[in-house]
């Protein structure tokens, strides 16, 4: 048991240590940019789509001497985009003095320029007389596997240096081409997640699946079909003692069905990530040993939890089985992201109901 717990802690730590917080900014303007808070203490993955006339405005607070890292990536669809950065002291930033390129690359071509003439007029006006430079996201590199959200990204360019001052820095993402760009901008390198970040992760992870090129219908369809198959199979294998244990208490009977549906959602979460992993494998067959992290955290454990509830749980069963079911629900609440929050919460409430009855 201690070995299993240690394995869970190890894989969870590995998952979070190789990750950044995904965010999808709403519509922004030069006067109302999207703020990336505490970028020296927290890393972000900024996702979205960028048309030829679109501009995404971002803002971050720099701390003098702390790492300043910006990394440009895209989805599988071939595209380019540029990132203008301006603020105090940027004339002293060279972006590439360590030959750093993206999250995982170390090559000399860092695609850095101080020529602002190709930027849209609105961006040049916003920059004014501020010190600035532009990162060109037009690199051609092999895809990298991201185990946290189970996806692939294609590095395009980047900047690694230190903030020259404690000040506000602005960024503008622009698209110099006609093709729509599905961008992923990494900002910061410190992995940090709040309680709320983990609770709301299912909804941004779902959006990253769609961002990667899958349709929303396919993502939801696989989840719903997996839940239906699991629940239908449970109904087909009902044992009489499942109902003998609850007698004529309709509330407990209904709650037991709710728990089976929740277990189906745990199973569906594992299947959803498995399908996503297979798609990654078809593009990049060598995902490296880091693939063990999503296999364990996002696929194996949720499916195991689902079948443990399937085979072992009874409303009036032993207390340690109920405690295990609550622990499984808590795990899925924070790490079973394709169980969409509501199903882990419901599973915990159902088990607590059975415990007090």
Each predicted region: which residue ranges?
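Beta-sandwich interaction modules
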Residues: 128-164
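Juxtamembrane interface at the cytosolic side of transmembrane helices
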Residues: 224-262
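Alpha-helical transmembrane segments of polytopic membrane proteins
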Residues: 214-221, 289-302, 337-340
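Acidic, Ser/Thr/Pro-rich low-complexity intrinsically disordered segments
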Residues: 50-134, 164-166, 173-178
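Membrane-helix boundary connector in multi-pass membrane proteins
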Residues: 312-343
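Edge beta-strands of jelly-roll/beta-sandwich modules across compartments, strongly enriched
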Residues: 79-81, 146-147, 152-153, 169, ...
């Amino acid at each position: 048991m201690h070995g299993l717990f240690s394995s869970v802690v190890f894989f969870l730590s590995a998952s979070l240590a190789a990750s950044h917080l995904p965010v999808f900014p709403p519509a922004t303007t030069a006067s109302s940019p999207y703020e990336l808070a505490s970028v020296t203490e927290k890393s972000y993955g900024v996702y979205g789509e960028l048309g030829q006339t679109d501009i995404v405005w971002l803002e971050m607070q720099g701390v003098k001497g702390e790492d300043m890292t910006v990394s440009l990536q895209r989805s599988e669809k071939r595209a380019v985009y540029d990132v203008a950065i301006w603020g105090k002291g940027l004339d002293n930033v060279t972006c590439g003095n360590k030959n750093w390129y993206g999250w995982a690359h170390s090559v000399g071509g860092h695609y850095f320029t101080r020529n602002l003439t190709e930027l849209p007029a609105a961006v040049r006006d916003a920059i004014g007389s501020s010190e600035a430079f532009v990162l060109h996201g037009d690199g051609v590199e092999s895809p990298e596997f991201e185990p946290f959200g189970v996806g692939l990204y294609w590095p395009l360019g980047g900047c690694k240096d230190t903030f020259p001052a404690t000040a506000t820095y602005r960024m503008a993402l622009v698209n110099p081409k006609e093709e729509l760009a599905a961008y992923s901008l990494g900002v910061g390198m410190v992995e940090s997640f709040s309680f709320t970040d983990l609770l709301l992760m299912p909804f941004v992870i779902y959006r990253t699946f769609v961002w990667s090129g899958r349709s929303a219908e396919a993502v939801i369809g696989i989840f719903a079909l997996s839940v239906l198959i699991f629940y239908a199979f449970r109904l087909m294998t009902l044992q009489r003692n499942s109902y003998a244990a609850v007698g004529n208490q309709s509330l407990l009977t209904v709650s037991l069905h709710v728990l089976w549906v929740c277990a189906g959602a745990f199973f569906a979460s594992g299947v959803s990530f498995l399908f996503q992993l297979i798609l990654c494998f078809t593009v990049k067959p060598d995902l490296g040993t880091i693939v063990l992290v999503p296999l364990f955290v996002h696929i194996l454990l949720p499916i195991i939890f689902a079948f443990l509830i399937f085979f072992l749980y009874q409303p009036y069963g032993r207390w340690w089985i109920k405690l295990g079911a609550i622990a499984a629900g808590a795990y899925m609440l924070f790490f079973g992201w394709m169980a969409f929050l509501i199903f882990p919460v419901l599973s915990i409430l159902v088990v607590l109901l059975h415990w007090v009855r």
